[in-house]
Amino acid sequence: MQQKEIKLQEEEENRILEYLKFREKKESPQSTKEKEYVTDAKKIKGTYTDFSKAISIGDGYILLQSEAQNQVEKLQKQTGIKYARIWNILSKEHCFSEKDGYNFRKLDQVLDFLLDHHLKPYLELGSKPSLFMYTPERSINIEETKTSVFDFATFSEIIQEVCVHLVNRYGVDELETWYFEYWNDPSLHSFEPDGEYYQRFDLLYQTMKRYSEEISVGGAGFILGYESMACKNIFEIWREREIHPDFLSFCSFQYIALIEEGERIGKKSIDSEYISNQMQIMKLIMQEAKFEIPELHIDEWNFTISNRNILNDSCEQGAYILKNCIDMNGQVDIMAYWHALDLYSDYYDTDTVLNGDSGLISRDGICKPSFYAFQFINRLCSKVLGKYENAIVTTNGRNHFVIACHNYKSLSSRYVFTDEDEIQLEDIEQYVEDIEPIKLNFTIQNVQNGKYLVKTYRVNRASGSVQDLWKNLDYSKGLMRDEVEYLKSSAIPSIEMKTIEVENGELCLTNNLEMQEIRLIDIQYQYNV
C-alpha cells in the first residue's frame, strides 16, 4: 500500500514538473485529451438567459464607502451584472433605534447608488450576520451589534415603515422589478409548524402585496447539501399554510452534512457537478413534499465559504464560475455569486495584495480571473447552438458567433483533508485531479461563406491572473502604489486576432487550453463593400 502511494506521488510530481517546464518556455503543453463539438448555425437549441447576472454584496452599508462604490460601478459596467443582493438594511446602527425611531437616509443612499448604476436591489430583510470565515468550523462575527433579531412587535412596525417608505420614494412600478427575501434564521424555528419564521414571512408578504401583487417576496436561503433533509419537513409545513413564497432561495457551498459525535458538521465535497446535482435533489424533495414554487434562486454560490482560501484568487475560480454558469443555464431563475468584493472581509490579517477571499475584485481594485469569467459570460449571444461539458456555442442568428470554453479541473481528495486557510500558493497544483491540457475542436456548420474575424480572449496562469503576476513580485507584502498599479494594469486577458475564410459552409477552430484556463472566442462575419 505504501509503495502504491509513493508511486502515485511520483507520477503527480512528474506531471507537475512537465507542466512547469512548458511554463518556463512560455509554451502550452501538448493536449492528450481531445473533444469534438459540432453545431449547426441553423438549429437553435435554446436560450442563454440573464440568470447568472446577479451578485451578493453582503452588508448593504458597505456601499456608503467610496472605494466600494467605485468597484461595484466597475463590476456592473464590465460584467453586465443586473441584480445586487444586500442584507442588514434594517440594522440598528444605520436606520432604526428603539429610542429614536426611524431614519432611512442611509438606506436611501445605498439604494439610490444601485439604481443610479443600473443595478436592481435584491433585498434580504432578515438579521443576517456578517461572518468572517476561515473554514466552516471557524468564523468570527465581525459586527455583533448588527445581527440581533427584533422581537415580533418591533419587526412588524419596522417592516411596515420601511415598505411604505420604499413605495413612496421609488414607486410601485420600480419595486415590482426588485426582489424581497426573508432569511431562515435558525432562531425562528422554521422546522416547527408554529415557528415564528412563518409569522414574520407572512407579515412581510402581506405588507408588500398590499401595494402590488407583482412585487416578488420569497425565502428562505436554505443550504444545499446541508439542509436538504430538513427542507422536506419545512416544505410540508409551508404547503399547508395559506401564504406561499413567490420564489424559493438557496445557498450553494460545496459541502455535505455529516453527523460526528452527535453534531452536524460540513465536510468538503469534490463533486464537480455539485450545484446541479444538489439542485436536482432539492427539486425532488419539493415534488415529494408537493410544494411547487415556480421560481428558484441560488442567491449565494461558491465552492467554498472560506474568506481565506487562495483558490478564490486563482485561475481555478474563473474556470469554476464559467463551468457552472454554462451548466446551470435553464435550471434556476437567478444565481447570485458569493461575493462581489474582497472589501467585504477586509480584516486585521489582510496585509497582502491577495488574501484568499472570494471577491471578484481585490481590496486594491485588481480584477481576478473570477471577474473575467463573468465578463466572458456577459458577452455571450442569447441563442444557444450547443452546450457541452467544456463549452457553450452561441449566436445572434446574423453571422455572429460567441464561444465560451474552459478546462476546469475538479478538486482532488487531498483538498478534502486540508484546512482551507492552510493551502499554500506553491502547492496549488496538488489540489486538483490532474493538470492535463485539453484540445477543443469546434465546427459550426451551415455558416455563410466568406471571411470571419476571430478574436480570442484568454485567462490562464500567463495572462489575466493577478495571483501568478504577484508570484513574479515574490508574493511581497506592502507593495508600493506603482507596484499595485502594475498588477492592476497587467492582470488582464490576452487577446489574439486572426481572419479565417470559410468556403464550404463549415467554420472550424481548434483551441488548446491549459489547466483551469478560460477563453472567449468572438467570431464575426466580415462584409464586403
Task: Outline where the language-model segments fall.
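Glycoside hydrolase catalytic-domain groove-lining segments
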Residues: 255-309, 333-342, 384
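C-terminal beta-strand-rich structural cap/linker in extracellular carbohydrate-active enzymes
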Residues: 478-529
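Short, acidic/polar
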Residues: 41, 62-76, 165, 228-238, ...
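Aromatic/acidic polysaccharide-binding cleft in carbohydrate-active enzymes
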Residues: 298-424
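Mature N-terminal, pre-catalytic/accessory segment of carbohydrate-active enzymes
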Residues: 1-81, 515, 527-529
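Conserved, mostly hydrophobic/aromatic
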Residues: 54, 114, 162, 180, ...
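Carbohydrate-binding surface patches
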Residues: 390-472, 513-522
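Substrate-binding cleft and catalytic face of glycoside hydrolase catalytic domains
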Residues: 79-270, 281
